[in-house]
């Protein structure tokens, strides 16, 4: 889900007839209606005007392939319903791009692209021009001999940092390969981590193990951290006095993505 910058609307993903559609409602959940259907629609991100939304549209691919392999970034005007492919720059329209996140000022977009061989975090102008990778890392995990990918970018409220997931893709784990290998699955999940990179790509640091980074309104990054004793993941947040748990997920429960509501 994603709350509009004016705090009045909520866009979220809803499964309808084995497809994932985008739905729009008031921040209180009233007046829900379908916004986008057809294919798999994920990871909506608002522009600052609180009218336009970009998102990732995915078409079916081969079994075992990552959804981002067949994705494009779309934009919709929620007032008119008009949609189009976001990137108009001629050099960019030939690439497959996914997982968009619009910068707080609406001038830049962070996204995931495989144009250099593996999924990396890229940043460009909103039309796709001046695109460049910003978070360099190793191409392969030395122990597993599998590609290291980067996904799920998230901008800090001040636009200076981008948090993202990094690790070996889940498609190499038993539920996707059909071959049970618990030890290998644990090795793969141990690679899941959240990183921070400056928006210009000059600075980078590891936050810790986990997935699905978000930012609190006051500029602290969160991550979903695996916890066997808890029977499911827990949400950790960095603070000025150290890291602590956000008690928002009940024990022994799975959860979906979450977003912060305006105060």
Language-model features: where?
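Sequence signature of WD/YWTD-type beta-propeller architectures
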Residues: 1-263
